[in-house]
Amino acid sequence: MTDSNNWYIEHFERTGSAIGYRITGKLDEVQSPFQKIEIFQTTDWGNLMTIDGAIMLTSKDNFFYHEMISHPVLFTHAAPKRVVIIGGGDCGTLREVLKHTGVESVTQCDIDEQVTVMARKHFPELCDSNDDARAELLFDDGVAYMANCPAGSVDVVIVDSTDPVGPGEGLFNKAFYESCFKALKDDGILVQQSESPLMQLELINEMRAEMGKAGFGSFKTLPFPQPCYPTGWWSVTMARKGDSSFDFRQADSAAKTFNTLYYTAALHTGVLVTPPFVQAALK
């Protein structure tokens, strides 16, 4: 919501907190069949996208999220070639994935085309790779897409979803994870945004439990800063089949030829160390 002093403020009842940005005006607004998308201009954080009133991203800090949901999982897999992104309509994750030259194809399936339309207009830097020949952009139900995905056809599934409410609700349960498990090859990896490790460890445990019921046997939750989200600290959770390691291709990561603003091989090594309070709470 905006107040009379030109601040956009989002209140988080579940964490008893709020985040605010000083804005200079609203740039755009669209009501899609699924949700209301708004774009604001801020004084210090570039453009701000909200969906149904919830802050999704800013120009200033989205790189934390997009890099951490993409590069750790891709350097953990031995040789990722076929990638599926569920959600991700702002296309920042797609851009990061396509920095990996070994990736041969990426299918992005987001239910709401208007998110991508708005990203192209107001966050064009995130859409640099939309026309890459390796990219396929679909606007459809991600749950149905994964249910119909051929068995053993995918190396990495990235679930770049909103919170587990509204259109994103069906992406956090056993049935969806079973579809991901089936679509992944034996050495495949699932990664999903998993909310704040400071305030939502219960949700992370619920996610891991549902993934386990679907057949996944190994999990790793990676925390990272994300200033525009509740608590300013976010996470992604990786899941693998069987008793698998989350060691990564450290030499390849260190020798990467593409630019990142946050992710490095050294940082990847550090983020694998789970903070004691998180480790104590995870089941």
Curated annotation (Swiss-Prot):
Pathway: Amine and polyamine biosynthesis; spermidine biosynthesis; spermidine from putrescine: step 1/1. The active site is at D160. Residues 5-241 form the PABS domain. Keywords: Cytoplasm, Polyamine biosynthesis, Spermidine biosynthesis, Transferase. It is found in: Cytoplasm. GO terms for molecular function: spermidine synthase activity. It is an enzyme of class 2 (transferase). Its main location: cytoplasm. Spermidine binds at H66, D90, D160, S161, T162, D163. It holds the Pfam family Spermine_synth. NCBIfam families: PRK00811.1, speE. Homodimer or homotetramer. This is Polyamine aminopropyltransferase. It comes from Stenotrophomonas maltophilia (strain K279a). The lineage of its organism: Bacteria, Pseudomonadati, Pseudomonadota, Gammaproteobacteria, Lysobacterales. The gene is speE.
